[in-house]
UniProtKB/Swiss-Prot annotation:
Similarity comment text for this entry: Belongs to the FAM178 family.
Source superkingdom: Eukaryota
Composition bias type Polar residues, residue spans: 259-277, 318-329, 519-540
Modified residues (Phosphoserine): 591, 708, 712, 719
Region called Interaction with SIMC1, residue ranges: 740-1278
Ranges of compositional bias, category Basic residues: 94-103
Annotated region (Required for interaction with SLF1 and RAD18), positions in chain: 807-1278
Subcellular location: Nucleus; Nucleus, PML body
Organism (species): Mus musculus
Residues covered by region (NSE6-like domain): 769-1271
Protein name, UniProt field: SMC5-SMC6 complex localization factor protein 2
Assigned GO CC terms: chromatin; nucleus; PML body; site of double-strand break
Subunit and interaction comment: Forms a heterodimer with SIMC1. Interacts with SLF1 (via N-terminus); this interaction links RAD18 to the SMC5-SMC6 complex. Interacts with RAD18; this interaction is increased in a SLF1-dependent manner. Interacts with SMC5 and SMC6.
Chain spans, region Disordered: 1-235, 248-337, 443-491, 509-582, 598-724, 739-764, 798-820
Length: 1278
């Protein structure tokens, strides 16, 4: 790839700046050089030399300042990206020893993007530098007076060790701006070179600073040779001189600080590590608010004012990097000082970068790049707090990825203890000796309190038992501040008493607790960067509104306060107060902490304004946007309630408890009780018993609120300045009173509002109780009795077949009784809109044929005896049966003795008659069926004897009549027609039967009904046997007897109880009887007239027609003739001789069809009604009833029409008759029906008309037309 020199733009200098080298570019042969080089043309040798110079590697420029326009070797951790961003405008020179690095996208490095954009703007505004390369200065993007430079000695310790191992040169440095892709690679290199890193970690502090000073001096001297550069070098020299002065002061004050610490060791007492829940997800205060407050607080003065007098290094504890978009990218004062300040490598400081990552020596690999951790450089103990905090952050995220809490705790505690063990504890003490250095470092590193809080909260989230031992602390006053604030310096060190490793913690000043609680509620404007992940964010800002105290006593007057299981303590005036956070105590975490407070109660009281406390609670609740709103409000209200209750129970000094937001994992409980009771509080033992109940209840409540597996591990830091109105303690306790039962003997003190509310609830519950009175019981008894009577009445109506009465039925006699309670207009309304659905029933009404009271009148199963039949037994079986009793005779019959006895011998007639009668009267249906089987087998066996001159026995007409008469059928029902009567009458039938059975026994035996219900099994058994007899012996009955049997069967089929029973056996017997009639053509008309007289109801007549089988020729003929006879009867026509020819029958059917008009039938009925009752007028109800009857009759007539037309095969000659029938059906019947939604019977009739018309159309289509005629034309009626 070659590069060309582009022509200079108008207004752009065409010659390079003085002292700069000409630009490296290729020139075409014959082209002119720039104006500065003259107008000569280059020779081929010059061109070759220029090409060589172009590809010649450039000299190392790693000693230039960041502000230098030349290309610097300070890279983004080996990525090859220059800080000045000049790589965007020229091609990089590749090194043979180093692979070409990757470019960092602007999304991953917002600083680089801002630098590149700034480079373009600088290029447009100020032209080019002397090397014709666009340059830019970092001072443009920094605050006024701020300089930026990052010496190599302040890189992370592990990075320095890895570079020493790899390059063996202390002057090869990398930029502090770290890229995401190379961080993991360096972590792997650190793991491989862990042994060498430990050896190289013992490098002396003087050597490291010697390399730093050499690098700084080289950069400063180099920057003087470049005119036009910024004053960054001069500023840096001032910073360097200030630092060396600080180092000299530290060395001079080592011994003094060590002696003072040793003097305070005598007053220290053993305590445990404080695992207080602190500000996980602390919010940073807005920059403009803190800047105003910093000016008002003298304690937050600038470092340069105290040490150097340099105003460019102003620092504030709440300053942090704020990224407000890609267009605005400025360094804060804190960031500037961190980049320009000098820190020794020995103390393992944590570096802050503009990128979204923070790397430390102990930072785990799984910290995401989106996290922004605001930490500071403080004393050695605070550094370890931050290290532990970052470890716990990594552990917290590991837990969220599925790793158990216990394994995560063991992981990071092992790493921390291994590093702590190798530390030189004496050097840790020496670093914090001088008071001036402590003050300076305290101002620079004020966020250490938040780091300690994060360590405590993260240790709580592990739920592992940690048994620390406290270390002594000392009180140090700050005379240079106007507030005279004293601070407890908290140390975390390692002691080995008895060979056991213990983490030791020094109690903190209550003032620090107030600062931390205030810092927890301060929102951060930069929190939107960390809201996209679930990691805990450590804020570097603290709230400046600290509690002012007049003075504090000496360290010798301090007393230790233990943590115990009580959450609330009633302390009188002057009692020792504590501001430790109280959270639910987990049974498996026996942790405790010691807190140093003065014994002087007057000086120890720390009043906290109620307004600040409410603001803190409000902001705490608004800071956690990842939780649901209901859970968030409930938790905040619970915390507020506990705080108010604990403060309200203190009589003299208020016990102010400050609560930080809950940790990601369920925190361990740390509670405070005084280990040494105060002399001024003799009633602590008594008050502790009263407070145990409330404490235990609150523990359970907190445990239910916080011990959840669904707790989120991250919190958002979006600021929410709105304050919500909190409910009072009485309201909250009233809501939760039912869910917090007391465990102690004394109930907890309930407020007045709570007592009043509970009393109201009790009164409401008592008012809603249900009480029985005498009047109510009497009323219930009456209602129950009335319902029982109604139920009995309904059952009786159903038993009698009347059904359930309804006022919707019109025309019924019972409906008027039910509607007596209704008004007349209501009754008329019901009649008008009532729907009539039962005008045309689906089944025929039937008749009562069997009278069960007369059943068994002639004989029964107990009077029938084979010995009284005159039978004389010859075989052994017959003798055995004759010797047996009545019951044994039936038993031997059913067991097959008679079948075996008469297998080869003719059965005597008395035995067959006895079996036939016993089968008809026996009440046991199983026995009746067995007897039928025996009787049929014997009959069939007797028919096989062809050599016998006697026909097998078949029951005579009198035997059949006697059996049915004994079942309860009257003699008139058996023979209903007067013209067709048998040779015997009822008296003869009874006398003959009694003679055969023995008259004495029958007379002496008492009479009692045999059947209480229809003996359908017995009836069907008799019909089956008759069917067998008519089949075996067709000539057994004469034509007259056959006709009487047919009429008998038709009459018995009208029985109401037989409507739901399929009468297949009846039809089989009818087929045999019709087939056995010898003179069929003569007898068919007489049979039709006799069947037509069996009933007067049209629907019963239709049932008789449908009972005739139509699968035989005689059956179809009987159906046709019977239908025509019935139609003539129903239409009041004269009985004429039924023509035998089919064509004539269809012609007669057309004449009847014209008379089936519903309106004409209604007129006839009305006239008939008036003739019968001339004095009565026909009202609407009667007219409606007559209309129902007319449509009912039309329905029956149409069915009979269908039976006539569809009961035989038709020829092509009958086609024209069916065409005429279709026309008459549509004209006279279909067109006369007016359907109504309330009159369903009309629709039912019209439906039947459509079905019949469809059948006729099918017949017409199947018939062949007349010769020479293709279509049927309409012919008008004559």
């Amino acid at each position: 790839m070659t590069r060309r020199c582009m022509p200079a733009r108008p207004g752009f200098p065409s010659s390079p700046a003085p002292g700069s080298s000409p630009p490296r570019c290729h020139l075409r042969p014959g082209s002119t050089a720039p104006a500065a080089a003259g107008k000569r043309t280059e020779s081929p040798g010059d061109r070759k030399q220029s090409i060589i110079d172009f590809f010649k590697p450039a000299a190392k420029q790693d000693k230039h300042m960041l502000d230098s326009p030349q290309k610097s070797n300070i890279k983004y951790r080996g990525n090859g990206l220059s800080i000045t961003g000049t790589e965007q405008f020229e091609r990089k020179l590749s090194s043979p020893k180093k692979l070409k690095p990757k470019r960092m996208s602007s999304e991953e490095s917002p600083i680089l993007e801002a630098f590149m954009k700034g480079g373009k703007e600088h290029h447009k505004d100020r032209g080019v530098h002397e090397s014709r390369r666009p340059c830019m200065s970092l001072s443009k993007y920094l605050p006024k007076g701020a300089g930026i430079y990052a010496p190599s000695s302040y890189r992370l310790p592990k990075e320095i060790k890895a570079q020493k191992k790899k390059h063996q040169s202390p002057e090869r440095r990398k930029s502090l701006f770290i890229h995401e892709s190379n961080r993991e690679k360096n972590d792997r290199d650190r793991g491989k070179n862990s042994e060498d890193s430990r050896k190289q970690a013992t490098a002396t502090e003087g050597d490291i600073f010697k390399h730093s000073s050499r690098s700084i001096s080289s950069r400063s001297s180099l920057s003087r040779h470049h005119p036009g550069e910024s004053t960054l070098g001069a500023r840096f020299q001032l910073s360097l001189a200030s630092y060396w002065r600080e180092r000299e002061q530290k060395k001079l004050r080592k011994e003094q600080m060590e002696q003072r610490i040793n003097s305070e060791n005598s007053f220290s007492e053993a305590s445990n590590l404080s695992l207080k829940s602190s500000g996980v997800g602390k919010n940073c205060k807005p920059r403009h608010e803190h800047s105003k407050h910093t000016e008002a607080v003298p304690g937050k003065s600038n470092l340069s004012t105290l040490e150097n007098g340099h105003l460019s290094r102003k620092r504030s504890s709440s300053d942090s990097w704020e990224l407000s978009g890609s267009k605005q990218n400025k360094f804060s004062d804190k960031r500037t000082e961190e980049l320009c300040g000098l820190r020794p490598e020995k103390h393992k400081r944590t570096y802050h970068t503009k990128s979204k990552r923070v790397l430390s020596r102990e930072a785990p690999r799984h910290i995401p790049s989106e996290r922004k951790v605001y930490q500071t450089h403080c004393t050695e103990d605070s550094w370890w707090c931050s290290a532990l905090g970052r470890h716990s952050q990594g552990a917290g995220k590991t837990v969220s990825r599925g790793m158990s809490i216990a394994s995560t705790l063991r992981l990071y505690l092992g790493r921390v203890i291994s590093q702590l063990w190798k530390m030189d504890i004496s050097q840790e003490k020496d670093h914090l000796q001088t008071r001036g250095n402590f003050q300076a470092l305290n101002r620079i590193n004020s966020p250490t309190k938040e780091q300690r809080n994060s360590v405590d909260s993260d240790l709580k989230s592990t739920k592992e038992p940690i048994i620390p031992k406290a270390r002594e602390s000392f009180l140090e006053k700050r005379p240079d501040t106007s507030h005279q604030r004293e601070k407890f310096i908290r140390h975390i060190a390692l002691k080995t008493p008895g060979g056991v490793l213990r983490l030791e913690d020094i109690a903190k000043e209550p003032e620090d607790e107030t600062d931390r609680s205030s810092a927890d509620s301060a929102p951060s404007n930069a929190g939107h960067h960390s809201s996209r992940n679930s990691d805990q964010v450590h804020s570097a800002s603290t709230k400046e509104t600290k509690i002012q105290k007049p003075h504090l006593p000496l360290p010798q007057e301090k007393s230790t306060i233990k943590r115990a299981s009580n959450l609330q303590k009633n302390k009188p005036a002057g009692s020792v107060t504590s501001k430790e956070t109280k959270l639910p105590l987990l049974s498996h975490v026996p942790s405790a902490v010691s807190s140093r407070v003065p014994l002087n109660a007057k000086n120890c009281t720390l009043p906290v304004p109620k307004k600040d406390k409410e603001r803190s609670s409000s902001k705490e609740r608004s800071g956690h946007s990842t939780e649901s709103s209901k859970h968030k409000e409930h938790r905040a209200k619970t915390i507020k309630a506990v705080s108010n209750e604990s403060s309200g129970k203190n009589s003299g000094g208020s016990l102010h408890s400050e609560y930080a937001p809950p940790t990601a994992s369920p925190p361990a409980a740390l509670e405070v009780v005084p280990s040494v009771p105060s002399p001024a509080a003799p009633s602590d033992k008594e008050s502790s018993g009263n407070s145990n109940a409330g404490s235990n209840a609150l523990k359970r409540k907190f445990r239910g609120d916080f011990d959840s597996d669904e707790e989120s591990l991250g919190y958002t830091l979006e600021s929410d300045e709105e304050e919500e109105t909190l409910k009072s303690l009485e309201e909250i306790m009233a809501l939760n009173f039912s869910r917090t039962p007391t465990t102690s003997g004394k109930p907890p003190a309930v407020s007045k509002g709570l007592r009043s509310q509970s009393s109201d609830m009790k009164e409401y519950a008592q008012s809603g109780t249900y009480t029985n009175t005498l009047e109510r019981l009497v009323k219930e008894m009456e209602d129950t009795q009335r319902l029982d009577e109604l139920q009995k009445k309904l059952q009786e109506d159903i038993r009698q077949g009347r059904g359930i009465k309804s006022p919707l039925r019109t025309g019924d006699q019972d409906s008027t009784d039910d509607g007596d309670g209704l008004l007349e207009e209501h009754r008329e309304f019901l009649k008008k809109f009532s729907v009539t659905v039962d005008a045309i029933p689906d089944h025929h009404p039937g008749e009562e044929i069997f009278n069960f009271l007369n059943s068994g009148k002639i004989f029964n199963q107990y009077t029938l005896d084979l010995r009284d039949s005159g039978f004389i037994g010859e075989s052994a079986v017959e003798k055995l049966i004759l010797k047996s009793g009545k019951t044994d005779q039936i038993f031997l019959t059913t067991q097959g003795f008679l079948t075996t006895a008469y297998h080869y011998v003719q059965c005597p007639v008395p035995v067959l008659k006895w079996l036939f009668r016993m089968m008809s009267v026996h009440t046991d249906c199983i026995v009746s069926v067995q007897i039928l089987s025996t009787l049929m087998e014997i009959t069939i066996r007797n028919d096989t004897f062809s050599d016998s001159p006697v026909w097998p026995w078949i029951p005579s007409l009198s035997d059949i009549a006697a059996v049915f008469f004994n079942m309860g059928v009257g003699f008139g029902s058996l023979f209903p027609l007067e013209t067709l009567q048998p040779d015997f009458n009822e008296e003869n039938l009874i006398s003959e039967t009694q003679k055969t059975l023995g008259g004495k026994e029958s007379e002496d035996s008492p009479y009692s009904p045999v059947f209480s219900a229809l003996p359908e099994t017995n009836i069907l058994n008799v019909v089956k046997f008759l069917g067998l007899c008519t089949s075996i012996h067709p000539e057994g009955y004469q034509d007259g007897e056959l006709m009487l049997l047919i009429l008998m069967l038709f009459k018995m089929s009208l029985e109401k109880e037989l409507k739901q029973i399929p009468l297949v056996d009846f039809q089989s017997l009818l087929i045999n009887l019709m087939k056995n009639i010898r003179d069929w053509n003569t007898k068919v008309h007489e049979l039709c007239l006799g069947i037509n007289e069996l009933s007067s109801h049209p629907h019963n007549l239709l049932w008789l027609v449908q009972l005739v089988p139509n699968w035989t020729s005689r059956g179809r003929q009987l159906r046709q003739c019977l239908s025509l006879v019935m139609m003539s009867k129903l239409l009041d026509e004269k009985h004429e001789d039924i023509p035998n020819a089919n064509n004539l029958q269809i012609s007669v059917l057309h004449r009847y069809l014209v008379q089936m008009k519903p309106s004409d039938l209604l007129k006839k009925m009305v006239l008939k009604k008036r003739a019968e009752q001339p004095n009565e007028t026909i009202d609407d109800s009667l007219h409606l009833e007559l209309e129902k009857q007319a449509y009912y009759l039309t329905y029956i007539l149409l069915h009979l029409v269908g039976e006539v037309s569809c009961s035989h095969s038709l020829s092509s000659g009958q086609r024209k008759h069916f065409v005429l029938l279709c026309g008459a059906l549509e004209k006279h019947v279909k067109c006369d029906i007016r359907e109504d939604a309330r009159l369903f019977y009309r629709t039912k009739v019209k439906d039947l008309v459509a079905r019949i018309h469809g059948k006729w159309q099918e017949i017409i289509q199947n018939c062949r037309p007349t010769q020479g005629q293709l279509h049927d034309f309409w012919v008008p009626d004559s």
